[in-house]
Amino acid sequence: MTNIIFDTNAARDFVAGVGLGELEQYAENIASRFNSKGLKLSVSPVVIQELLYHLVDSNDKDFSVSFKAIKAMMLVQEYQRKDGVHAMMSPSELLIANEIYHMRSESRELMYSQLMTIAMVLSHGDINHIPDLHTIDGGTVKTYVDDIESGFATQIREVCQSVEFMSKITGKSFEEELNTEATEISIVTYFSRTTYNLLMNEGKLPDYHLFQPPFLSDDDERLRKYMWFTDLMMKGNKEIIRRYPAFLKLFKEVIRRIHKSNNQISGERLKNYVWDISLMFHVNDHTVNHEPFRFITTDKAMLLASGAFRNSNNVMNYGEFHEWLMQNDEL
């Protein structure tokens, strides 16, 4: 089977022109067509989270289409699986926790599980009865997403400015400096630190704040712990770079665009990139669970420019995908 992954905008395009009362039949028809072509819809909680963001306020301009996108995707998956089980693709934090630290973040697993449960409830409900949209920490989905997006926009600008500064110091071109190991480690730290903090808050990893510099002359134990921490982070970051090249390439492409715009690219535009980059963790070794995939997007040009996809057949604009899906021939 070939996995089909929608990014958030493609998920909205997926239900464009479909009425609320037509969603169930539409989803059943799409599931049948997917099956006939050997396709399997894979739903990311990252996309569900972005769509739920627009359901917090019924006056949101994307309220209706986001509801329809969630309902249609969940129903397609349900019709395809026929076992009542909704598969959840692991977001970046869970992948890093499991594959790099060999641990589980139960708190984050629970949060994503709750989001997928809400999506499942929505798939059998109606648009006038939206369930409570709070995350595990008590904040709304909107608050959580806003915080992540704002932090990312600030962080990626800082990385870009650091690359620009270092290129002046070293005499290297911007592109050469962007591709140094030091820059790649800086980029990856954005994700690895998030996961470390999650595991730290669950008591599974030590609180690094307790052994940060400066050190006194008799601080041998704190120094030893600090060296252990930095070694753990360095090894983990290098392993993330090795295992997940697609996310790193897209991250770099966004940095290039900031640089080329003279840092004039808007904050609103930057914020949305964090979710696109997060989705790239799903395409580890250019498969999904060792099965082929097609990534359906509204920004194919950028993904191809980044080099995240070695095979251009693995990424399609939604229009291309829809046109092919409605044909009877093979891909």
Locate the predicted segments by residue:
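Short, hydrophobic beta-strand segments that form beta-sheet elements in well-ordered domains
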Residues: F293-T297
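Active-site-proximal, substrate-binding regions of enzyme catalytic domains
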Residues: T2, T8-E291, A301-L331
